[in-house]
Design a protein with these regions (language model features):
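Gly/Thr-rich phosphate-binding beta-strand-loop-beta motif of the actin/hexokinase/Hsp70
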Residues: 2-30, 122, 128-150, 166
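Short beta-strand-loop/turn "lid" adjacent to the catalytic site in phosphate-handling enzymes
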Residues: 55-111, 147-152, 158-159, 187-198, ...
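Glycine-rich phosphate-binding loop signature in dinucleotide/nucleotide-binding domains
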Residues: 57-60, 125-127, 216-219
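Glycine-rich phosphate-binding loop plus the immediately following alpha-helix
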Residues: 38-42, 111-113, 118, 123-127, ...
Length: 262
């Protein structure tokens, strides 16, 4: 049975659609889990979902827990879970966390924890001006400078949310599996939908990247990072994306915790 090291950290990212969790040892993620978000689950039910990720005989060896959430109700459930099952100290990452980021926004308290983690993760991992695109329930596009200036964010309906809304409202359009489109203009309903849904989202992202670069010509190099559950689907269609980094959010939470702790 796997033994945890003396420095083992559980990181939890609570989103609107999914909850992702990672176990970190010696600055490396060694295990990962993802499951659907639901306010109807109890702390005990969520703990049962964590069991495959954890060595339940060594819970006390997890000496720190890091959490970020954009769902307050789920945050309360998970804090109860930590109190009930763990003895580790819990660190919440939010806009008040002392990370050295300068937020050029009207009210930093409204910035989602995931956006903060993405920005900080990009800052620490890539040491460059960065565009971070996160494909989740919403698609977020944010820009942070190498010096740590959080310049702002664009929020659009996520690809799957947009597709679900279309299928729900259009009587003659049946739901389809979202896969890479094979044509630009479809000659049947399925291909037409795939092109409009997937290509349309990708072209929006490409345009945003180019517009951000146009507005920041003073930057020597801008690294564009794509993350989120469907990043692999969209990545081939967005030429200006440099990196697919599916762990940047969890990594960002972990790196934020390390920065605050030390």
């Amino acid at each position: 049975m796997e033994k945890y090291s003396e420095t083992t950290t559980l990181v939890v990212d609570i989103g609107n659609t999914n909850i992702t969790c990672g176990i970190y040892q010696q600055d490396e993620m060694i295990r990962f889990a993802r499951f659907y978000s639901s306010a109807h689950r109890t702390a005990d039910e969520y703990f049962s979902l964590l069991i495959p990720l954890l060595n339940t005989e060594s819970l006390n060896n997890i000496n720190s827990i890091v959490i970020g959430s954009v769902v307050p109700e789920l945050m309360r459930i998970w804090m109860h879970l930590f109190q009930k099952y763990f003895s580790a100290e819990v660190w919440e990452i939010n806009a008040l966390s002392p990370l050295g980021i300068s937020y050029k926004v009207d009210d930093p308290s409204f910035i989602g924890a995931d956006l903060i983690a993405n920005a900080f993760g990009a800052l620490k991992k890539y040491d460059s001006d960065c565009i971070i695109i996160d494909l989740g329930t919403a698609t977020t596009i944010q820009f942070i400078t190498k010096e740590g200036s959080f310049e702002g964010t664009a929020i659009a309906p996520g690809l799957k949310v947009s597709a679900d809304a279309l299928f729900e409202r259009a009587a003659l359009l049946s739901q389809i599996e979202i896969v890479p489109p094979s044509v630009l203009l479809g000659t049947n309903t399925r291909d037409a939908l795939l092109s409009g849904i997937v290509n349309g989202h990708a072209y929006m992202l490409e345009c945003y990247i180019q517009q951000i670069k146009t507005h920041h010509t003073d930057c020597q190099k801008i690294v564009t990072i794509l993350t989120g559950g469907i990043a692999d689907l969209v990545y081939p269609l967005v030429p200006s994306v440099d990196i697919v980094d599916k762990t940047i959010t969890l990594d960002g939470f972990y790196l934020a915790y390390k920065t605050i702790r030390h």
